Amino acid sequence: MTIAPTTLLLFAATALAELVGCYLPYLWLRKGGSMWLLLPTALSLAVFVWLLSLHPEASGRVYAAYGGVYIASALLWLWWVDGVTPTRWDLLGAACCLLGMAVIMFSPRSA
């Protein structure tokens, strides 16, 4: 299906925007960061919402499928940003979520 790479890239960009938008307030609230971090937070979360709106599918289907990509992306964040290696159980869970995302987004639909 030709839409798959575009959909997956859009989901990945959406997850990055959401993760950044959630991580910046964490830096402010828990790590002593500046309150000015809330400005890029707002921008990042606005980009997140805009990216979710670009999918041609029904919004509920997009949100459900996006959840699987978000989980996998959050585990990559755990590894790359937090420096914590995901366990095999983390990876198995993410694989199950990504399989669910693929079923939701790429299964045949009747008109």
From Swiss-Prot:
The keyword Membrane applies. It holds the Pfam family UPF0060. SUPFAM superfamilies: Multidrug resistance efflux transporter EmrE (SSF103481). Belongs to the UPF0060 family. It comes from the Bacteria. It is found in: Cell inner membrane. This is UPF0060 membrane protein XCV3198. GO terms for cellular component: plasma membrane. Its main location: membrane. HAMAP family: UPF0060. Keywords: Cell inner membrane, Cell membrane, Membrane, Transmembrane, Transmembrane helix. Disulfide bonds: none annotated. The chain crosses the membrane at residues 8-28, 32-52, 64-84, 91-111. It is a multi-pass membrane protein.
